[in-house]
Amino acid sequence: MLKIIKKIISALGYKLIEKKLYKNSINLEILNAINTKDVLRNLYKNNLVNKIVQIGANDGLRFDELRSFIIEFNTKALLVEPIPEYFLNLKNNYKDQKNIVLENSAISVNEEQKIMFKVDSKFYELYQDHVYGLSSFKKSHLIKHGVRNKHIISEKIKTTSIKDLLNK
């Protein structure tokens, strides 16, 4: 019966997602943002941060709790973003910062090419702002976030190991 309802809803251009998944993700975002900024502010005030590695830096603006601290305190930072489209924006958004090293890779065990899934940019306006930065090696991860299968594209990206990354 649920399959029939899902097909009808899908034919109308909608998708059913678990209510608790959506509700929990919103609650976590709110709590996480408050706590993260407080913790970072405290660490910086006490001079406990001098280098940062940010995995999944996206464009350096959206949902980025670190950007203001990196710029304000001139922190040395290694910013990693696998999706070429987002990486170009990241590069542009930090172009005036001399303390930044940028890496266009995903993290994996080895240096290799892997398939990563993301929302096709043609469909961004159909979703909430967070889908812009939503990408994964698993297509099911995007579907779990309410992205329709036909709105997902794959992209071959470069990967590197943590060890190799930290040696850069």
Locate predicted features.
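Phosphate/nucleotide-binding beta-alpha loop and adjacent structural elements of enzyme active sites
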Residues: L2-K168
